[in-house]
Amino acid sequence: IIARVSQSLAKEQSLESLVRQLLEMLEMVTDMESTYLTKVDVEARLQHIMFARNSQKMHIPENFTVSWDYSLCKRAIDENCFFSDEVPDRWGDCIAARNLGITTFLSTPIHLPDGSFYGTLCAASSEKRQWSERAEQVLQLFAGLIAQYIQKEALVEQLREANAALIAQSYT
């Protein structure tokens, strides 16, 4: 895993490319059917599934938006419970979890280096799976890598905008 992560980070690539590789590795470590990255718009109270990897019967759709207030991820954060292998019992009123058939859920929030909340990195399965310290550590490591990459992309965009403004100003 470490070698693959190093190779992924060494290549200059898009956020999507990096995340897809990390989701695949996360699936192997967690033994979950689906792994996915979400972005949360706290003001609009919406959670958007940006990228998902589905390897078995469970299918978490990409480009799918759900109410943040009723999501498993928000409940996990609010209750400080980032793993459950009893989702139907613990969060049985969560419609999305029930419709997707989620039994086991693992999640971690993603905070950008400036401290702002970005979204979540999650893994889910319709089968009961055991908690693993290794899986949780990898999940948190990958969340940190994604946060760093997002921050890097934002800084590069700011530099491009500043450069364009300087060029435009030089013509005046």
How would you name each of these model-derived features?
Residues 58-82, 93:
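Acidic/proline- and glycine-rich, intrinsically disordered low-complexity segments
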Residues 24, 36-64, 68:
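GAF sensory/regulatory domain recognition
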Residues 103-112:
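A short, aliphatic-rich beta-strand micro-motif
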Residues 31-35:
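Short N-terminal helix-loop-first-beta-strand/juxtamembrane motif that initiates sensory/input modules
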